[in-house]
Amino acid sequence: MAKKITFNEDARRGLERGLNTLADTVKVTLGPRGRNVVLEKKWGAPVITNDGVTIAKEIELDDPYEKIGAELVKEVAKKTDDVAGDGTTTSVVLAQAMVREGLKNVAAGADPISLRRGIEKSVAAVSKALLTSAKEVETEAEIAACASISAGDPQIGDIIAQALEKVGKEGVVTVEESNTFGTELEITEGMRFDKGYLSAYFVTDAERQETVFENPYILICDSKISSVKDLLPVVDKVIQSGKQLLIIAEDVDGEALATLVVNKIRGIFKSVAVKAPGFGDRRKMMLQDIAVLTGGQVISEEVGLKLENATLDLLGRARKVVVSKDETTIVDGAGSSDQIAGRVSQIRKELENSDSDYDREKLQERLAKLSGGVAVIRSGAATEVELKERKHRIEDAVRNAKAAVEEGIVAGGGAALLQSGTSALKDLQLTSEEAVGRNIVRSAIEAPLRQISLNAGLEPGVVVGKVSSLPQGHGLDASTGEYVDMLSRGISDPVKVTRSALENAASIAGLFLTTEAVVAEKPEPKPAPGPADPGAGMDF
């Protein structure tokens, strides 16, 4: 297909038009007085949201150059959202400000490469200053304050703080839709996976239809168990120890399953068999996780271990095991804390190197099961539109709160970015050409506060001047129009959110400024309509 190529200033301005269209749509949502945007859907009800990345994803432009410009800025919003769970609108506002000022300087004859270098050095200095000024999040109330700002609802903030208090910063907090009104929290203790008992005869608690064992042995096997001859030696050893047995294997069937069931019914020996979670390589990894957690070993011929030769020291242990029809929970595995920490570190490295959203999600789940736990927040609403919007807000607020716990918090409302940034840039030593890049960043760090005050109906220039003269950490409470100590008022941003927004905006601004040509698809001319059928509509 033929391509359309544009060079120099025309190329950059085409990209900027797309950026501005997207940014102007997104930035109206910034701050406590930000407005909503309604998104039409091809199917179902429209969505009402004030989340920057959700709005950005929906925008598709006709002009090929504008479309490319908009897509580049979508990446800024998406990357910030992935890393920090919030700050998407801030990152778009910062990118727009940097590109606008940068293109003015390029048009006036500035060297784009020196500009980009100046921007990168300036942003690194501001990021360092933000990290230095960050305050650690130590109390549940501080976590709740961060989550409340992101979600726009103090009740949601409190629930998220409770969830993180229970599962820790490595734990998984999932958000599900509920059929009832309100928001509720459910905490899962220990490691849980979605596989239940292979026979209802294993049940020990008839009322709850669950198998509950205290201090059982846990046999972990990566192959199918059908022959009772293979299973009998290890079962005999467990019977002699007077304990119960949980068997996790690829499958347990035939005479092996029948023997276990008969022994349970006759009261000779209590056991329960479940299928291993996952598939393929992921199953092997999850079995290894269970082995590390319980202090056992995976019985696998790949490592020279056979089921018929298994001894008690190869089996895992746990304080409690609960198995229902659909899931298995292992509480307080007896694995060594050093081995668990090593496994957690290994999974975290895989997480950092993974590009796939699906793989990252599964790795995060494994990490949580090993190191923290799982909390489920169930949210309900009156309409489907409200439910989707509320669920999305809670998901963002969870990531926001985790970011706060990870790197600490700074004054919100654009105050920390302006104050820390201004002082950091003042002392930065740059060449004369790079200093122009510093001026671009200095102008851009005012942009979020300007937009927040504009959305609140205030005069941006006056607000920026006032906040610049206030002590560090003081700023504008846009919901009331007062100038206050932001952290004591509970108005804060996770430093990771502010830092990610600034760094991602600078990255895309550098690409815009150093672009000399844009190659786009040439729109195909629409075929002319064919001649009308002269006989159409006539009745013969």
Swiss-Prot record:
Q: Report any one BP term from Gene Ontology.
A: protein refolding
Instruction: Kindly name one Pfam family recorded for this protein.
Output: Cpn60_TCP1
Does the keyword Chaperone feature in the UniProt annotation?
yes
Give yes or no: UniProt keyword Nucleotide-binding. Answer: yes
Matching entries from PROSITE patterns are given as:
CHAPERONINS_CPN60
Query: Coiled-coil stretches, from where to where?
Result: none
EC main class here is isomerase
Q: Which UniProt keywords apply?
A: ATP-binding, Chaperone, Cytoplasm, Isomerase, Nucleotide-binding, Stress response
Q: Identify the CDD domains for this entry.
A: GroEL
Any one cellular-component term (Gene Ontology): cytoplasm
On the tree of life, the source organism's domain of life is Bacteria
Reactions accelerated catalytically: ATP + H2O + a folded polypeptide = ADP + phosphate + an unfolded polypeptide
The subcellular localization recorded is: Cytoplasm
> Looking at the record, which segments are called Disordered?
520-540
So where does ATP get bound? T29, L30, G31, P32, D86, G87, T88, T89, T90, G413, D493
Record-listed E.C. numbers: 5.6.1.7
MF terms from GO for this chain are: ATP binding; ATP-dependent protein folding chaperone; isomerase activity; unfolded protein binding
Main location group: cytoplasm
Q: Which family does it belong to?
A: Belongs to the chaperonin (HSP60) family.
Alphabetized NCBIfam families for the sequence? GroEL (TIGR02348), PRK00013.1 (NF000592), PRK12849.1 (NF009487), PRK12850.1 (NF009488), PRK12851.1 (NF009489)
The record describes the protein's role as: Together with its co-chaperonin GroES, plays an essential role in assisting protein folding. The GroEL-GroES system forms a nano-cage that allows encapsulation of the non-native substrate proteins and provides a physical environment optimized to promote and accelerate protein folding.
**Subunit details:** Forms a cylinder of 14 subunits composed of two heptameric rings stacked back-to-back. Interacts with the co-chaperonin GroES.
What HAMAP family does the database record attribute to this sequence?
CH60 (MF_00600)
- This one is known as Chaperonin GroEL
